[in-house]
């Protein structure tokens, strides 16, 4: 019994994304260096997750490995470089993160290595350091050539990164605000009558038992410096 996909990994990606809204076409590339051959393809869809798969000598590496590290690192570098060149990222702006750049990406990286090394018995993670270098080299050369000739596709990819970065920054601000509020709030049950001053060296807190005592203390306190 033979399993055959006429379009190779391009067809594989099309099949994975067949029920999704495409943002780009499937982009494929290939190359070879130092006896290691690299074949890759990717497509962006209108989703907020990434799906990047790695294979070495037709073995699926469920935990990824150095070939995926090379791809991800180089791809992020390329997109940030173009984003600055196109003035989409200003001088004051931080670079997109790797997850930003891969937002909505489905990708497959397949290499052929003459002497593959894996972590563990199950071959779920590739461990060859030269694989990262070769994949990065091929990705850098081939995708730079592609994006130079396909500006609209490049802008669509950068648009996905911008959207992810905006969401990430919004979530970070919300988390920071929540932590800041928790830092300055000691009231866990709604019964703290806080003082107005934020200078801890001048403030004091009184702990009283019962609502009656609490009410009297609140009336008599100095609101500027005394909390009940």
Spans of features found by a protein language model:
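GHKL-family ATPase ATP-binding module
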Residues: 1-228
